[in-house]
């Protein structure tokens, strides 16, 4: 059994405006042993960056990353391989 937990960070504080910049996840087995963990950092589809939001990565680093379509298949495969998915702050 595989359990996927993930969190999405955005540059604006909203997850529905194309500002997603990080998809961080942890994949664990049924005993909660970590199989894999990773931060997928991507350039958002917006130029807005809220100054009140403290991001884990520098703005220049985020802007230099590929956009979401480059990671879509990786994220889709990850989700398809999990038996349970737990998302934090996904709305």
Predicted regions and their residues:
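Conserved non-catalytic scaffold segment of RNase H-like nuclease domains
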Residues: 2-4, 8-91
């Amino acid at each position: 059994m595989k359990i996927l937990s993930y969190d999405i960070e955005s540059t604006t504080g909203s997850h529905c405006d194309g500002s997603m910049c990080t998809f961080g996840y942890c994949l664990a087995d049924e005993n909660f042993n970590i199989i894999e963990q990773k931060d997928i950092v991507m350039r958002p589809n917006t130029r807005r960056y809220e100054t009140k939001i403290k991001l884990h990565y520098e703005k220049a680093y985020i802007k230099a990353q590929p956009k979401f379509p480059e990671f879509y298949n990786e994220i889709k495969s990850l989700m398809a391989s999990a038996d349970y998915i737990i998302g934090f702050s996904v709305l």
